[in-house]
Amino acid sequence: MSCFVGDFFGRAPQARARMRRGLLFAGYLLAALLLSHWFFHSGVLSKVDTLFHLNRVMGIAAGLAAGDFPVYLHGYQMQGFGTADGVLYPDLLLYVPALLVVCGVPLAAAYHAYWVLVVFLGLAAAWRGYTLLTGRAFVGLLAALLFSSSYFLLFCLGTSVGAYVAISFLPYAFGALYALLRQPRGTRAWPELVLAFTVIAESHVINTLFFLLAAPFCVFAWRRGLADRVRRRGLWRAALFSLLVNGWRLAAFAFFYARVDFHIRHPFFASLAIMTSDAGNLFAAQFWWGWPLCLLAAAAVLARAFRRRRLFLLTLAFCVFLTSLIWSGFPWRTVEQLPWVGHVLGMFQFSMRLLPLGLLPLALFLARYLAVFCRTAARRLGAGCAGRAAALLLALGAVAYGLQAAAQTAFTMGGVDIRWQVAYEQVTELPSFGPRVQPDYLYADVEPEALFASGEVPAPGEVRAVAGEAAVSSFAKRGTRLSFAYVSPAGAEVQVPLFFYPGYQAWVDGAPLAVAEGAHHVLTLSLPAGAHEVSVRYTGPWFFRASALVSLASLMVFFFLWACEWRRAHA
């Protein structure tokens, strides 16, 4: 033990460096445990979209259990008829809880394990991103903690399985882009940019669009690095591999979105002006910043000396503008009447989704201010070594306060009372449709509750003859795969309990069988006479499989090049 202590403290510079690293890791670990403590519970955290996200997990699990990968269609939702959520909702990290469910882990435990995982990953990604932006791990951690303490991000915690991950990885993506273009040793940062973008693109569509819209402005602002040929090559590599690695989802998304009219293309809120709040309710929602960020911003404005003060004030003004978009007095209806603008804005659904684009750089400036303020105050008190610890404790306090505030949600938006307290529910039987299970990527003209109640479609496990006669036996279904045997004296046209989507294939005794779209978009088969066995599965159009192979090959090449970059950097 004495040898260990002597080795640890024998050299003051090494000892201080180890203590700093230990302090940073302890701060990260404590913050991650604070942010994830809601999920160390036997029940399922009860939030508005919980049942919907559990359905997504079960849809992926059903596909994996059937041997499908990727799982394009979720065969659990809508009484097993299936939805296109797997194509149009990015859900890469949801494969983790789905795989746990397949392995026998209870659904509630698997879902909470997902949230614990993404909290730790998201905070680490934000820390890494801010470190790349500042070149200092300590300021990077402070910025990550302040960003994670924002009321908006904590509102998403437990509510939006994709948005929380994507927003947490935005600092990483922008940090990797900055390092690639501006940092002295950042020429090898392009693989990190690909990694960060892939997580964003495979988690949330809207935040992917936000990054793609903001990235050109960042490249222009940091354009000095484009003069370096190595940096230009790295930027092109990042763009190319980001496209190739995620091409499998892009191809499927574009195909379906262009051909199928889904519920989500007809938003419930016709205008962004609907989901807004008056000044009093904005105050109750802490302006979606959280009081710690508001107080730090006010203190930074009043500070006499502040590095890059003009840029900070511009960032603050931008945040205030984005916050005003959530105010009921903002003229959204007038803005939406502008040519092309209204159609594009409708995709965002809620104006508050824009706010992280302002909070992200604001957290960086506030972290710098907090670090300088605590260091200066500690020196004046004769305790210079306590400055870092004080700043870290204040940032952790902001996270703790934000969690406490988010656990007592109470404000009004769009005339709707939004109230929530930490509560859990026991999901013994998971409904596959109905309240809290949104039919976002179901045909827009299908209302599942009314349709299933009408009896106009087959019941689960039923093969219904709509023309001719067929005696069915040995029916089996898992995910979007089903099989059955039948006997028909003269052939029959039957409906099976699946919604039709382009890409279904069927076989009768191993020979291809034509599939068609019947009434209410139900998959219909024309069966030949005799005794036969039928199997149905979703494979997707041929270019789905081709794009998946290209993405897989690109991923392997990407990791090989990343390994080469890493070896050169550590040679």
What are the residue ranges of the model-derived segments?
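Active-site-proximal, structured, solvent-exposed surfaces of multi-pass membrane proteins
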Residues: 17, 455-571
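Extracytoplasmic
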Residues: 124, 397-481, 489, 495, ...
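A generic structural signal for solvent-exposed, polar alpha-helical segments
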Residues: 78, 210, 254-259, 293-297, ...
